[in-house]
A protein has these predicted regions:
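A short helix-to-beta-strand connector/capping loop
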Residues: 41, 172-178, 215-218, 284-291, ...
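Rossmann-like dinucleotide-binding cores of NAD(P)H-dependent redox enzymes
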Residues: 139-175, 227, 251-296, 353
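Helix-enriched interaction subdomains in cytosolic or periplasmic regions
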Residues: 73-86, 195-206, 210-211
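Well-formed, non-transmembrane alpha-helical positions, independent of function
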Residues: 12, 35-36, 60, 171, ...
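Rossmann-like dinucleotide/flavin-binding elements
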Residues: 31, 37, 108-140, 180-194, ...
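Short, hinge-like loop/turn segments at secondary-structure boundaries
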Residues: 1-3, 40, 62-65, 155-159, ...
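Local beta-strand N-terminus motif with an aromatic residue
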Residues: 42, 172, 195-196, 320-321
């Protein structure tokens, strides 16, 4: 959904009626809301999901603290949670559905020295929650920036995720957190920091299917693709029809590639919320150069394409210039095991446990800090 999806309709209605007109639809950026109200003459903007992501959004706007707003991702996690188990959840607000913990927080028995390893969504949330609870925090990130979520740079429809990532990273940098970029955890660093607890948010690596040709020159990982990536030829086969595979397929089709999504199961995108899945399936349906093949198991890759078998064992060929591997993520278990030797109070969050979406990662980071010292 585009920001202000219904704004044009509301502005036109306002021209013909004297009664107040209210519009709604993916509004969350204060400057754009103010500009729309001024230009259109519409009387009011209503917000729903933006206030789930940040219930204090109006107060922050009034006080000029726009940079502190937690932006809504428009991911539908709030709606999907209600449909799934009748409990509302939010990808960026770990308190939603657990409001009693916000107004009556579990007390911190003792302020401790925490070492958070990894600056993705789980690590950033852990650092924010730790500061709120009065702990001393050192956040170590091996790359040159906080935020993770590099795949969000690959597609226009990931703009909300990029905004969340960048604003959350800025929020962490503004807190009394000792942030160390381009840094790995060593014996010397642990001896210097002397952590009482370690929270490992070290993420996961893309996993390649164990089939012949999986390491060929025409194979790239979906999580590592860049926008208009020059490595991608015209005809593309995406191996894996989960959320990442489907979204990569959609974006590649929009760039003009001929794309086939190859999935072993009978349905696509089973790993995302119901509302988001409906949107993804709709995008696949309307994309003219995007095709799907479910119920096929990849058996090999070569320079001409992909070999697969159907449920009956019949072999089928899918020609391709480029194969995009979206077969899943593998937690960095070796790194987790290495870090666990440094501290007896040790927590693992986010993709380092298993493949996670943003909402699960932020809740992991929050929960780990709340459990420190209990």
């Amino acid at each position: 959904q585009k920001p202000g999806e219904n704004s044009g309709l509301a502005a036109e209605i306002k021209k013909h009626v004297k009664t107040p007109v209210v519009t709604v639809g993916a509004f969350s950026e204060p400057d754009k809301m103010e500009a729309f109200l001024e230009e259109s003459g519409v009387d009011c903007i209503a917000m729903g999901r933006a206030l789930i992501a940040d219930p204090f959004l109006p107060r922050k706007i009034m006080r000029g603290k726009v940079a502190d707003i937690t932006p809504c991702l428009r991911c539908g996690e709030c709606q999907s949670g209600m449909m799934r188990n009748k409990t509302m959840r939010c990808a960026v607000n770990p308190y939603i559905g657990r409001e009693a913990e916000y107004f009556h927080p579990i007390p911190t028995r003792e302020h401790k020295n925490l070492l958070v390893v990894g600056g993705g969504p789980a690590g950033m949330q852990a650092a924010i929650t730790a500061c709120e609870r009065g702990h001393k925090v050192t956040l170590v990130e091996k790359s040159d920036r906080l935020g993770g979520l590099k795949y969000a740079d690959n597609a226009d429809f990931k703009a909300n995720i990029r905004r969340y990532r960048d604003m959350t990273a800025a929020k962490v940098m503004a807190l009394p957190v000792d942030v160390r970029l381009n840094t790995v955890v060593t014996d010397e660093l642990v001896a210097e920091v002397k952590p009482d607890a370690i929270i490992a948010c070290v993420g996961a690596d893309p996993w390649a299917l164990p089939v012949p040709g999986a390491s060929g020159e025409n194979v790239v990982f979906g999580a590592e693709l860049k926008r208009a990536d020059p490595r991608v030829g015209h005809k593309v086969v995406v191996i894996g029809g989960g959320l990442i595979g489907c979204e990569e397929g959609i974006e590649l089709a929009k760039e003009g590639h001929e794309v086939t999504i190859l999935e072993m199961q009978e349905e696509l995108c089973p790993d995302c919320g119901r509302m988001h899945r409906l949107s993804v399936l709709h995008e696949i349906e309307v994309a003219e150069t995007l095709h799907t093949a479910t119920g096929f198991r990849c058996t090999g890759i070569d320079a001409e394409g992909v070999s697969a078998v159907d449920a009956e064992g019949k072999e089928v060929r899918f020609p391709a210039d480029t194969v995009v591997m979206c077969a899943g993520m593998r937690p960095r278990s070796t790194e987790v095991e290495r870090l666990s030797k440094y501290c007896t109070e040790f927590y693992v969050c986010g993709d380092a446990t298993r493949a996670r979406q943003i909402g699960q990662a932020t809740r992991d980071g929050y929960d780990a800090v709340v459990n420190v010292g209990l």
